[in-house]
Amino acid sequence: MNHYEFVQTDSIHFLKEWPKDEKIDVVFVDDWHSYPHVKKQLELLDQLVGPSSIILLHDLMYGNTDPFYHADLSHAGPQWDEGGPYRAVAELNPQFWEWSTLPWNNRLTILRKKYSNKYHRR
């Protein structure tokens, strides 16, 4: 009996194909880092996670060894366009999302959707 499945594929396609009635417990996002791409991933994940799900994102503090978020990474190339993954996460509504970043090795962010009677069924 498998309790996990490792899948290596295009993330947008994968998330679009995932059954909406099957919640994802843990997902690790370390993909193309442009703002539009990460924003789309988070929009799709919004439908697939609940308050007990965890989304792990890599590289929100990418760019140097200091533990600071970077919204402008135009110097880093097109993969970081328009603010990169930090901007996509920073724009999430804090009423419905909470997150924290561990400041080591380009940083690991833990993102969780908060429970809301308005938007979630138990």
Language-model segments: which ranges?
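S-adenosylmethionine/decaboxylated-SAM
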Residues: 1-122
